[in-house]
């Protein structure tokens, strides 16, 4: 193998790694009180009304993050963390039916009562697992970094008393894009 080709491939691999794990400083916009910002970079894939496990109506917002999106996860609003659980698992292609149950995932509940956002991060084909630096009862500030996920799907569950401020197909940036408000 030619040394120039090997040097080129090494440089390309280095650039890809630096790009995938970049951690840009973000200026957190000052939205009105009770605002909810995006937890991950990506594209809004779906917004629907669902019935949650408590039998209450909620909004379900799905964000798909790819390899080219920033992988840093950010806090949706200033609050206390109610739950934080990381479930280790596989990193299979999302087209495989079992991937939904077997892939690594992280469940976090931000806030309590009527001001609560449930977040589920599911990893898809990735060489790096989900990193979560939160634990229960942590006090967190809107836009603060709390973890890392390269190539995955993030589901946000908002209470039905919230107002959603995004549309399907919209590109969102963690900590900067307004997802909605608590009413």
Regions found by a protein language model. Give the residues of each.
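Contiguous, well-folded functional domains in the mature portion of proteins
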Residues: 1-183
